[in-house]
From Swiss-Prot:
The modification N-acetylalanine is found at A2. Residues 54-194 are annotated as: Interaction with HSP90B1. Residues 101-114 are annotated as: Required for endothelial cell death. Residues 111-138 have a biased composition (Basic and acidic residues). It comes from Homo sapiens (Human). There is a cross-link at K137 (Glycyl lysine isopeptide (Lys-Gly) (interchain with G-Cter in SUMO1)). GO terms for cellular component: aminoacyl-tRNA synthetase multienzyme complex; cell surface; cytosol; endoplasmic reticulum; extracellular space; Golgi apparatus; membrane; nucleus. The modification N6-succinyllysine is found at K269. Residues 107-147 are annotated as: Disordered. The lineage of its organism: Eukaryota, Metazoa, Chordata, Craniata, Vertebrata. Gene3D superfamilies: Nucleic acid-binding proteins. InterPro entries: NA-bd_OB-fold (IPR012340), tRNA-bd_dom (IPR002547), Tyrosine-tRNA_ligase_regulator (IPR051270). Non-catalytic component of the multisynthase complex. Stimulates the catalytic activity of cytoplasmic arginyl-tRNA synthase. Binds tRNA. Possesses inflammatory cytokine activity. Negatively regulates TGF-beta signaling through stabilization of SMURF2 by binding to SMURF2 and inhibiting its SMAD7-mediated degradation. Involved in glucose homeostasis through induction of glucagon secretion at low glucose levels. Promotes dermal fibroblast proliferation and wound repair. Regulates KDELR1-mediated retention of HSP90B1/gp96 in the endoplasmic reticulum. This is Aminoacyl tRNA synthase complex-interacting multifunctional protein 1. CDD domains: tRNA_bind_EMAP-II_like.
Amino acid sequence: MANNDAVLKRLEQKGAEADQIIEYLKQQVSLLKEKAILQATLREEKKLRVENAKLKKEIEELKQELIQAEIQNGVKQIPFPSGTPLHANSMVSENVIQSTAVTTVSSGTKEQIKGGTGDEKKAKEKIEKKGEKKEKKQQSIAGSADSKPIDVSRLDLRIGCIITARKHPDADSLYVEEVDVGEIAPRTVVSGLVNHVPLEQMQNRMVILLCNLKPAKMRGVLSQAMVMCASSPEKIEILAPPNGSVPGDRITFDAFPGEPDKELNPKKKIWEQIQPDLHTNDECVATYKGVPFEVKGKGVCRAQTMSNSGIK
């Protein structure tokens, strides 16, 4: 019995010690929470102080700009008295000063409407001249772009390799592909090929891509290029690059040299004007006005079986 009592006492003692330790740990956790909140508050306060300082600086700069503009427009500046507090009996004089300032500003505005000072006229003329120069430059750039012939050289056609293909989550007839076109990151491409090409045949497939169409969303997925195919009302076949092609290889046309547009302007309908002249010939070779799609030093692009068909 004595032994049992001793064991019980030890257990009670250990239990009391455990309670004390738990209470101590609770206090420490509470202190740590308070400390963390305090640190977060201090960080936020510091951040707000920095932002306030920036805002004050911006306000001061804007005030100085406003003062300079008023001076240029002939508005008289009334300095505020320094170190002299305004008392209740000075309200009348304050109102007089304010009304004078308003009158002066409005008179300055009237002068500005009438034509402004000589300096202001010069500044306006300078701005107008700059605007005219900028407009002329933009017109010349647009003119040079429009002066390029509308032919297949405007298209950025490249070899790509489909890394993965999957069905579109919201459209039964569409595939979503990730395609390597020789850039840092693959491009996402949406194609309406579900009814023409089995999914397993899309994986790791070499294709030809039109890469400078403006990216467009297709049922919620942004498509960044278009897979080129031989096409008829009954059938579609993906065009195949020549053996030895690698992602990023350019498609060229001997009779149509030139650099492609960075991005085809949808308003100019350039692709729509070129597409009717894209066909496969009697030997299933892809052509533009009879000139083959070619990868320099590697060969021509072709359809599997579709001859004398459109391409899109």
